[in-house]
Regions:
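SAM-dependent methyltransferase catalytic region
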Residues: 1-185
Length: 185
């Protein structure tokens, strides 16, 4: 069933231009099955379409395009662990160093923790009662491995869809290599 659903968005997920950066949001992530299937497809497409030397950086951009919210703490932890595990397994299969001390692992872990949030999509609040905040990971034009991080709230997306303005203010981040985003924290 998951694969049939993903087949409906194959151009955005695997074959279209800029497929790596096309974002996907799961409002009820559960233990991450849908998110893992999305990442798995993106990584397979990356493997088929891009040179191997670009995989570490491009896989981080693929991971950064997957977002989710989960209400239950155990499911939230399972979703984060499974998504990170899928990422690490991809790199282990291809001989790319991705141990806990590598920048690749630490950046991936930071992205997963920033993009998969424990909270309630209906209220727009995280587990602590604060607004759910995500980060856009915008690729800097002309600098293939550099990202500009920009925070946004879930409610700002809902407000934009309703035609109202958001007055949320978030910190500004300097452009950085995507494999060094964990150093900003």
């Amino acid at each position: 069933m998951v694969n049939q659903m993903l087949d409906l968005v194959k151009p955005e997920l695997e074959t279209g231009p800029d497929f790596i950066g096309k974002t996907f949001f799961e409002p009820a992530a559960g233990d991450g099955n849908f998110l893992i299937a999305i990442l798995r497809r993106k990584l397979a497409a990356l493997e088929n379409r891009l040179p191997a030397e670009t995989w570490p950086i491009e896989s981080l951009f693929a991971l950064a395009s997957v977002y989710g919210v989960e209400l239950l703490p155990d499911n939230h932890a399972a979703a984060q662990a499974a998504l990170l595990g899928e990422f690490v397994d991809f790199h282990k299969r291809h001989g790319n160093p991705c141990g806990r001390r590598t920048n690749l692992f630490q950046a991936a872990n930071f992205i997963v923790r920033s993009n998969i949030i424990q909270g309630d999509t209906l209220t727009g609040l995280d587990a602590t009662g604060k607004p759910i905040v995500f980060s856009w990971w915008n690729r800097v034009p002309g600098e293939s491995s550099t990202v500009q991080r920009e925070d946004f709230s879930l409610t700002s997306l809902q407000n934009t869809a309703e035609g109202t303005l958001s007055f949320d203010f978030f910190p500004a981040y300097a452009p950085t290599r995507i494999d060094h985003v964990h150093k900003e924290a």
